[in-house]
Amino acid sequence: MGFCSGRCTLLALCALQLVTALERQVFDFLGYQWAPILANFTHIIVVILGLFGTIQYRPRYIVVYVVWAAVWVTWNVFIICFYLEVGGLSKDSELLTFNLSGHRSWWEEHGPGCLHEEEATAGLGALHGQSLVVGAGCAMVHSYVEALHSGLQILLALLGFVYGCYVVSVLTEEEDSFDFIGGFDPFPLYHVNEKPSSLLSKQAYLPA
C-alpha cells in the first residue's frame, strides 16, 4: 500500500512538473531566453523518462530522473541568484540569451498589473521612430516572478527526488527478493539438462 501511494505521488509530481515546465517554456520562448529554453527542454525530456519509468517499473529510468532532479535544483538556484543579483550576478546581463539578443524576461513588460508606457527612443536603440514598450506600475517586479517560478521548480524537484529515491529502493528490493527466491529453486534447469547426458553416457558403456 505504501509503495502504491509513493508511486502514485511520484506520477502526480511528474505530471505537475511537466505542466509547470511547459508553462515556463512558453514564457521563456516569448522572452528569447535561450539558456532557460534549453534547460527546460532537457527537463521535460527527463521528466517524461521518469514518468515512463514509474509507469513501467523501470528503476534505471527513475535513477536518471533522480540525478537530474539534483541538477535541476542547482540550475534554479542559479536562476534565483541571477534575477535577485546575488553573488555578483546582474539581471541586466545577456547571460541567459547567450549574447545573441538584447531581450529580457517576458515578465519585465507583461508582469501582473503592469501598465505599458511607450517611451520615445533615440540613437542606436531606435530605428525609424520605433518606441520601446516598458512595463510600469507592476504589482510584482519581474525578478520576483522569475524567482517564484524557480522556487516552485525547486520544491517540485526536491519532492520528486525524495519520492524517486523511495520508489527506486522499493523496486530494487523487490527485484533482489525475486532473485533470492529464484536461487532456491528445488529443480534447477541444469539438473534437467544433466539427466539425459548421464543416460547417454551409460548407454555408451553397455555391451552390444
Curated annotation (Swiss-Prot):
Tissue specificity note: Ubiquitous. Expressed in multiple regions of the brain such as cerebral cortex, thalamus, hippocampus, olfactory bulb and brainstem as well as in cerebellum with low expression in granular cell layer.
Keywords noted in UniProt: Cell membrane, Membrane, Transmembrane, Transmembrane helix
InterPro entries tied to this protein: Na/K-Atpase_Interacting
GO cellular component: membrane; plasma membrane
Compartments, record wording: Cell membrane
Pfam families documented for this protein: NKAIN
Lipid bilayer topology: Multi-pass membrane protein
Transmembrane feature ranges: 35-55, 62-82, 151-171
Assigned protein family: Belongs to the NKAIN family.
Quaternary context: Interacts with ATP1B1.
Protein name, UniProt field: Sodium/potassium-transporting ATPase subunit beta-1-interacting protein 4
Gene: Nkain4
